Amino acid sequence: MKNAVLVFLLLSVFALSVNAYGYGCGWYGCPYGSKCICPYYGKCYCVPVYGKNCYIYGCPYPKVCVYGVCKWRYKY
């Protein structure tokens, strides 16, 4: 029974580690000059403090927000 509890605890720690690695800035912060935002639960991104912060502020009308950067909607 003790082994089962130990395995459960190890798996829990492993799951938390994977989660922290996947959504790093929610746990570890961001490099200087950027900040962490979490637009969706559990998914966090580092975005620049100045300039391209479209997750928070959006983009001017013809442009759309793609991975934190404003891009032209129809330009490929």
Curated annotation (Swiss-Prot):
One of its GO terms (cellular component) is extracellular region. Residues 1-20 form the signal peptide. Its main location: secreted. It is found in: Secreted. Prismatic layer of shell (at protein level). Expressed primarily in the mantle with equal levels in the mantle edge and the mantle pallium. The keyword Secreted applies. Keywords: Secreted, Signal. It comes from the Eukaryota. This is Uncharacterized shell protein 4. It comes from Margaritifera margaritifera.
